[in-house]
Amino acid sequence: MTIQPAVPTSPTNAAPEAARVTPMMEQYLEIKAANPGLLLFYRMGDFYELFFEDAEIASCTLGITLTKRGKHQGADIPMCGVPVERSDDYLHRLIAAGHRVAVCEQMEDPAAARRRGNKSVVRRDVVRLITPGTLTEDTLLDARANNYLLALARARASSGGNRIALAWIDISTAEFIVTECSTGELAATLARINPNEVIVSDALYGDPDMAALLRELPSVTPLTRDVFDGATAERRLCDYFAVATMDGLSAMSWLEATAAAAAVTYVDRTQIGKRPPLSPPSREAAGSTMAIDPATRANLELTRTLAGERRGSLLDAIDRTMTAAGSRLLAQRLAAPLTDIAAIARRLDAVAAFTSDSAARDDIRTILRTAPDMSRALARLSVGRGGPRDLAGLRDGIMAADRTLARLSALPDPPQDIVAAMQALRRPSRELARELGEALAENLPLMKRDGGFAREGYEPTLDEARKLRDDSRLVVAAMQARYTEETGVKTLKIRHNNVLGYFVEVTAQHGDKLTSAPLNATFIHRQTLAGQVRFTTSELGEIEARIANAGDRALGLELEIFDRLAAVVVEAGDDLRAAAHAFAQLDVAASLAKLATDENFTRPEVDASLGFAIEGGRHPVVEQALKRAGQPFIANACDLSPGPGQTSGQIWLLTGPNMAGKSTFLRQNALIALMAQIGSFVPATRARIGMIDRLFSRVGAADDLARGRSTFMVEMVETAVILNQASERALVILDEIGRGTATFDGLSIAWAAIEHLHEANKCRALFATHYHELTALSAKLPRLFNATVRVKEWHGEVVFLHEVLPGAADRSYGIQVAKLAGLPPSVVARAKSVLAKLEAQDRGSTVRALVDDLPLFAVPSRAADESAPPGEAAPLIEALKALHPDEMSPREALEALYALKAKLPKP
């Protein structure tokens, strides 16, 4: 397996011969060479140490001291280290910075190494590769977000172009999903899934056609071809899931199986012998979710604001969940609204049940508050990284399932989704909960190695070992009292550390007393520090051996108990995961009901029509912000439904001044539609939505300097995507198209875009503009409706009323807005003067005349001497018709162009 290094991590020069380095450094270099591209955490006692450039990288990233240890080819070896006890914090920061880490542990204690020979080095080996997509520890994960590893596999489709298969896994929750898409759909699909790490073949990684897309992803790992070998894919999947044939798994295409096998192979290799259980891959049908491209997701601020913050996003505004799993599920649904009308209705039924029965909703939410994150606790236990608190969490989860079932059983007629959740909650064994309850103590340590987690009385043999250990400690306390009396040193203490074991410690001023006769016959000097002197005695050594043996035996017995309980829990994994998912579903339904009640949302109607009728619509995020400020939100209606005798939805052309609320109105209608299709009530008094298959938004733009694109270029690229891809079932919102260039250029582009939306796309759309001349198009385009945002002038000032009404604005009030922004009075006065002169030219009348003169999609006529295409052009025309530009990569398009040129008649 090849892992792409984020930065160089190997020693600068070639590896030295064994004779030129210490045995420890020889071992380090061998392990490092076997794990290229990863920072090597090399265990040295209570620390993980890093060397060479790994140390320099870690020191810089973590802000820890860079020191040195020994020399390598005449130069000092850079070194830094982190305590094992705090390593999770450092690992989290390294992974967040884009690095990958190989954890190398000591596989034996130093005593065992000494028995093998005085020059033997402690055996070490890499036990795990930590990458962004393969995390399980709660300290490394965001509790409210999934952590997906995604594999991409590509193949040429029989109809031309490429097909892409995607397989994504969250090993912390066992989720495993596969799907296929076209090259043109890949960016939108990746934006929806939002993977933390993407694995691709070396060939795909080096493909220039994929370079731009891969650069946008947070972490991309290229792997060798064998990982993406379709010929061995089914065998590898069957091996991972321990099944004889693929019949036991979901039906998958050959390409999907290739991606799925790559994903599980990578998981297997990074976990090194600790194979995490996964759910069988679930196949996501094409078109089952609303397509939303990356630009639209960003513009609408669905899960993150444009500044990258969760606060201020739609997810933040609607998330009332009580559990981490519920929050993750809500984020998944928001990223992938459904197109299945029946499934949407089932979700709405569940929300409605909790909306109408507030007592049941509040009781369920109270129970859910105590429910642990069962999926992630189970995942940690399955790979040997769990602790006693994970076992207790699963025990508490089963008990919470009983309380939840008891409360839901009181519902008179629970809807289908709630009934399904109840069935899942019945699956875990109550006997398992009883066993865990009997085994675990009240106060549990975080780590199993700390011991003390088994309840007294659960295991008699353990109780005996603990008594012997604890009695020995009482002997130490009595010994300290006796030594204090014998020496007359009241500050004498018996202490313990991992280096010296048990020792007698006195302050420096009493050190000479214990080293002088007659006390020096009893007290043997061990260590002198700045303020203390340490001694041992033969009696203390004997007691230490007894305590160590008793303590080791007690801990060993406890670890056996833990491993036995963990194995039973992992065996019941499928039932526990089903219950965990049921908790998440109930949490989302109850939280959306709470949201609907608190914010006065209503149940939307979602059907198969092309209707779009919203009454009293509000922006879910802006309304809450205004409410916190003590201000009301002005609700507005929007109706894009086909008119009488029409078969396609309407386009609203929205005009009005800056700051009047046009962009808010556009966004709120898109968000209402999206919320309806995730199965949520919506901020409106009434809403009827004909199912939307694609959502497009071009609202706001900024320079993309990294890719050499101006604001206007970004705007045009996003607009091109919309005009090329929007279907009749799409909803499009466009704001200020054409504003980033010369006035007449921009007006012409906006004009042509409206015509295209009306005649070619035939979709439902909201189009905001300051080109008031475009309102005259409503006379030519029957499905174009003019709307404006109402304002009022009062004593020379403009008052924004935020009401959307039929009609067209005659002014943009730009100068008044500039005055409100604080432009100097002289600039405002001059602007008014210039505006008056420009308006006197009555440019608008010229444009209105063009509306009458230009037919739709008119193009300049051919020159009089231009002849019609010759008959031999027919093959070219047929070849052009066979092309599908949206499914072609740039390279494929170029090859097609050369092929067409070759078909031209020779002169």
From Swiss-Prot:
What GO molecular function annotations does the UniProt record carry, in alphabetical order?
Answer: ATP binding; ATP-dependent DNA damage sensor activity; damaged DNA binding; mismatched DNA binding
As for what it does, the entry says: This protein is involved in the repair of mismatches in DNA. It is possible that it carries out the mismatch recognition step. This protein has a weak ATPase activity.
> What Pfam families does this protein map onto?
MutS_I, MutS_II, MutS_III, MutS_IV, MutS_V
Organism placement in taxonomy = Bacteria, Pseudomonadati, Pseudomonadota, Alphaproteobacteria, Hyphomicrobiales
Q: Which InterPro entries match?
A: DNA_mismatch_repair_MutS, DNA_mismatch_repair_MutS-lik_N, DNA_mismatch_repair_MutS/MSH, DNA_mismatch_repair_MutS_C, DNA_mismatch_repair_MutS_clamp, DNA_mismatch_repair_MutS_core, DNA_mismatch_repair_MutS_N, DNA_mismatch_repair_MutS_sf
Q: Provide the alphabetized UniProt keywords.
A: ATP-binding, DNA damage, DNA repair, DNA-binding, Nucleotide-binding
Organism, scientific name: Nitrobacter hamburgensis (strain DSM 10229 / NCIMB 13809 / X14)
What gene makes this protein?
A: mutS
Task: Report residues binding ATP.
Answer: G656, P657, N658, M659, A660, G661, K662, S663
Its GO biological process annotations read: mismatch repair
Keyword hit for Nucleus: no
**Name of the protein this chain belongs to:** DNA mismatch repair protein MutS
Q: Name one GO cellular component term.
A: cytosol
* Similarity remark: Belongs to the DNA mismatch repair MutS family.
